[in-house]
């Protein structure tokens, strides 16, 4: 899938050095390399990389399947390239690959208004909070669910 200056493809083990670089700059409590290796090794997951014209990773997404529900576990873009449609395209591709009729869940920091707004555009809705979910500062996580397709899925970029 192409979107302007980037392409989305399956995430590969060879992408992990670039993924780790983005991860460390994007999150105060980054995933470990082992966590990424574990998720990529699961055949049922959807693990995607957004790459630029030189095949450099500019964003990535990890979504795991648990029984009948998909859990969006990690999504990040190169900090300097945020708000360029990368996350939106990764989410669109995830839903296309995992199924438009599937159920999805995720957790997001309650202070992350931009991410919450993006998820809402894809039909995710708040379903409560996980108190003190984030270890770095004890912030709550909003639990969001997407239980049915909506007319705005994958809309405007």
Q: What are the residue ranges of the model-derived segments?
A:
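Short acidic N-proximal helix/loop "leader" segments that mark the beginning
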Residues: 1-3
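Acetyl-CoA-dependent GNAT
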Residues: 6, 10-84, 88-99, 147-156
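Well-formed, non-transmembrane alpha-helical positions, independent of function
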Residues: 18, 117-118
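Ligand-binding grooves and catalytic loops that recognize ribose/phosphate and carbohydrate rings
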Residues: 70-71, 109-114
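Residue-level recognition of the GNAT/N-acetyltransferase active site
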Residues: 78, 82, 109-111, 136
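Short glycine/proline-centered loop/turn elements that form peptide/ligand docking sites
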Residues: 87, 91, 112-115, 132-137
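Conserved GNAT acetyl-CoA-binding A-motif
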Residues: 98-108
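Conserved catalytic-core motifs of GNAT/GCN5-like acyltransferases
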Residues: 105-107, 120, 125-142
């Amino acid at each position: 899938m192409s979107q302007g200056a980037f392409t989305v493809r399956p995430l590969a083990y060879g992408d992990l050095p670039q993924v780790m670089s983005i991860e460390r700059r994007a999150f105060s409590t980054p995933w470990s390399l082992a966590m990424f290796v574990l998720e990529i090794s699961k055949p049922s997951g959807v693990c995607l990389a957004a790459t630029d014209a030189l095949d450099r990773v500019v964003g990535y997404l990890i979504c795991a399947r648990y029984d009948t529900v998909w859990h969006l576990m990690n999504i990040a873009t190169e900090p300097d390239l945020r708000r360029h449609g990368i996350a939106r395209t990764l989410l669109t591709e995830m839903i296309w690959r995992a199924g438009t009729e599937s159920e999805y869940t995720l957790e997001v920091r309650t202070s992350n208004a931009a991410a919450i707004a993006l998820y809402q555009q894809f039909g995710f809705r708040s379903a409560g909070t996980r108190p003190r979910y984030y270890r770095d500062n004890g912030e709550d996580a909003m639990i969001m669910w997407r239980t049915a397709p909506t007319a705005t899925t994958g809309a405007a970029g």
